[in-house]
Amino acid sequence: MKLNKYIDHTLLKQDAKKKQIDSLLSEAREYGFASVCVNPTWVEHAKKGLEGTDVKVCTVVGFPLGATTSAVKAFETKEAIQNGADEIDMVINVGALKSGNLALVESDIRAVVEASGDKLVKVIIEACLLTDQEKIVVCQLAQKAGADFVKTSTGFSTGGATIADVTLMRETVGSDMGVKAAGGARSYADALAFVEAGATRIGTSAGVAILKGELADGDY
């Protein structure tokens, strides 16, 4: 198994410096990860830094709270793609889901899907804040809205990916969508366990350590 191609090599910290982003890009080139995941302000820089490789540029929309309007999320998506993004990780409107406003949750996702054109859209459900039933419902809504992936977590809330959540999400969406586990893999064994549970991507800042068989510091 080429585990490197499961990994979105991630740096989303608000205080990330250019030299840290450059290090992320260098590691991505060396290890051939699926993508780098960076904040929108770094997308153009990342695209240039990955020219000549097959590493994709992933960015985040409505991040990390998901509480911006659908129009803002759509604008963020379009601008990110103009700047070179290949993949969009968007955060759902968690408050709307919790309030039972499922129509808003679905239309919010659909707004990003439509703005993305042919680019990949991953829907962050922030599983740590949801009941199992809410996880099932929002995965179904993401599927209905035409998204490509469901993703467990932002890494900025109360918890990251769990095996139980990845298993439930995979059971819900079947084989039609990708499932991304984010914020829970700190070792090769962790990453492998998520893949075996049904994850097709792993979002982590510890990609290099994982591939080296080391235990990473940090929680994303």
Curated annotation (Swiss-Prot):
Keyword terms, alphabetized: Cytoplasm, Lyase, Schiff base
A Pfam family hit: DeoC
Residues of the active site: 89, 151, 180
Pathway entry: Carbohydrate degradation; 2-deoxy-D-ribose 1-phosphate degradation; D-glyceraldehyde 3-phosphate and acetaldehyde from 2-deoxy-alpha-D-ribose 1-phosphate: step 2/2
Highest taxon in the source lineage: Bacteria
Catalytic activity, as annotated: 2-deoxy-D-ribose 5-phosphate = D-glyceraldehyde 3-phosphate + acetaldehyde
Location(s), subcellular: Cytoplasm
Annotated GO CC locations: cytoplasm
EC code(s) of this entry: 4.1.2.4
Any one GO MF annotation of this record: deoxyribose-phosphate aldolase activity
UniProt keyword Cytoplasm, yes or no: yes
GO BP, sorted A to Z: 2-deoxyribose 1-phosphate catabolic process; carbohydrate catabolic process; deoxyribonucleotide catabolic process
Family: Belongs to the DeoC/FbaB aldolase family. DeoC type 1 subfamily.
Functional description taken from the UniProt entry: Catalyzes a reversible aldol reaction between acetaldehyde and D-glyceraldehyde 3-phosphate to generate 2-deoxy-D-ribose 5-phosphate.
NCBIfam families in the cross-refs: deoC
Protein name: Deoxyribose-phosphate aldolase
Lineage, highest ranks first: Bacteria, Bacillati, Bacillota, Bacilli, Lactobacillales
